[in-house]
């Protein structure tokens, strides 16, 4: 075995590998974009994607969602909006937790949803749970699209990645209800919002 040739080849291979691994700012476009976490459709003025593709938008199609245009958000685009922090007592452990994220009304304004208070808003979770409310209720209850729980990003498989939620402790008619009944309008794992003009 020629040790010199072996060592030279190993050194060159090591230099090439360290050069490749040392490039921290290399951008791989195929992996650069964050995945979409939230799709807003219906009566909105702004869109950034085309129609639902029944073959590739499987979860949306299974939940009978249809649209010609929609506005999609990834985690950075939601988490990057102006945040609100709330501290409701949660039904799952009967303890107060800190939740933060943008106001749902701000997110709806960003996509150009109608400003009328009787605009219908459907919030849909990945497990198929869906609730309908109005923009008036969204505003009155100060719904947030929570991205963080106790300072950590909400996880898929937990209560996230996004949770439409309000501080039920600060809403007298909800605070008077049993804990298990306070959050019926708050789907965790929210992934789709349908806006219907009144």
Residue positions per predicted region:
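N-terminal export signals
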Residues: 5-23
């Amino acid at each position: 075995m020629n040790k010199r040739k072996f060592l030279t080849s190993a050194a060159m291979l090591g230099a090439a590998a360290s050069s490749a691994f040392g490039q921290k700012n290399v951008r791989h476009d195929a992996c650069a974009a964050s995945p979409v976490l939230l799709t807003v459709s219906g009566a909105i003025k702004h869109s950034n994607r085309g129609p639902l593709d029944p073959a590739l938008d499987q979860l949306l199609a299974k939940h009978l969602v249809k649209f010609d245009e929609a506005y999609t958000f990834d985690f950075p685009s939601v988490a990057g909006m102006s945040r609100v922090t709330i501290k409701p007592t949660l039904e799952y452990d009967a303890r107060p937790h800190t939740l933060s994220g943008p106001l749902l009304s701000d997110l709806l304004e960003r996509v150009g949803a109608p400003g009328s208070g009787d605009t219908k808003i459907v919030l849909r979770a990945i497990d198929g749970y869906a609730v309908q409310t109005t923009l008036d209720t969204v505003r009155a209850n100060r719904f947030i699209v929570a991205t963080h729980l106790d300072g950590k990003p909400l996880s898929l498989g937990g209560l996230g990645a996004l949770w439409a939620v309000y501080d039920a402790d600060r809403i007298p008619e909800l605070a008077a209800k049993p804990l298990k009944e306070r959050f019926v309008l708050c789907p965790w794992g929210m992934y789709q919002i349908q806006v219907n003009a009144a």
